[in-house]
From Swiss-Prot:
It comes from the Bacteria. It is found in: Cell membrane. Its main location: membrane. Keywords: Cell membrane, Hydrolase, Membrane, Protease, Quorum sensing, Transmembrane, Transmembrane helix, Virulence. The chain crosses the membrane at residues 50-70, 83-103, 105-125, 143-163, 164-184. Essential for the production of a quorum sensing system signal molecule, the autoinducing peptide (AIP). This quorum sensing system is responsible for the regulation of the expression of virulence factor genes. Involved in the proteolytic processing of AgrD, the precursor of AIP. GO terms for biological process: proteolysis; quorum sensing. Belongs to the AgrB family. It is a multi-pass membrane protein. Its EC number is 3.4.-.-. One of its GO terms (cellular component) is plasma membrane. The gene is agrB. This is Accessory gene regulator protein B. GO terms for molecular function: peptidase activity.
Length: 189
């Protein structure tokens, strides 16, 4: 199935290359972009499919949106391969929300962890990788935006009821953990 999809992407990219008179580098960039979109599409189906089966859709969505918006500016560690990404995503966005939502983790614990997360984001964000470097001229702006978004989510969470309050805070905790340099190979930082 994966080879079939990859072959279709390759054929489509070649057609676009010929039609638009693109060089090899532009073709490879376009092909990679299509692969990322397709991979993210399938990952989304898996994560939200599992969350629907577990009756956790809104829990998953709350954590994922908080995580996604902060990650846009904070960046952070990525899984080493696609399989690990699927596994980590199910853990982050289905298992952990289940634990926080159904085991009823206290607000005090979650706010403490989220405030520690804010400090971590303030220190380490944005976290660049070898595959996704961040130009020096963008670093300061991304750091400020990541901190501001984290503060906004902390404020919004004050007005939410349990478990959504804790789930929003969980998104902050997850993205902050992915900022630590220990999750990057030596050549990445």
């Amino acid at each position: 199935m994966v080879k079939f999809i990859d072959a279709k992407i390759d054929n489509f990219a070649k057609q676009l290359q010929q039609r638009n008179n693109l060089d090899r580098i532009e073709y490879l960039k376009m092909r990679l972009g299509m692969q990322v979109v397709v991979n993210n599409f399938f990952k989304t189906i898996v994560i939200y499919g599992v969350s629907l089966l577990c009756h956790m859709f809104l829990y998953t969505l709350t954590v994922h949106l908080t995580f996604f918006f902060i990650r846009h500016f904070a960046h952070g560690a990525h899984a080493k391969n696609s399989l690990l990404c699927y596994i980590q995503s199910v853990i982050y966005f289905v298992l952990l929300p289940w634990i926080v939502g159904y085991v009823q983790v206290s607000s005090l614990i979650m706010y403490t962890l989220a405030l520690v997360g804010l400090i971590i984001i303030s220190i380490y964000a944005p976290s660049a990788t070898k595959k996704q470097p961040i130009p020096e001229r963008l670093r300061r702006g991304k750091k400020i935006k990541a901190i501001c978004l984290t503060l906004i989510f902390l404020l919004i969470s004050l007005f939410l009821n349990e478990p959504y309050q804790q789930l929003m805070l969980l998104g902050i905790v997850i993205i902050s953990i992915l900022q630590f340099p220990i999750f990057f190979p030596k050549e990445d930082y």
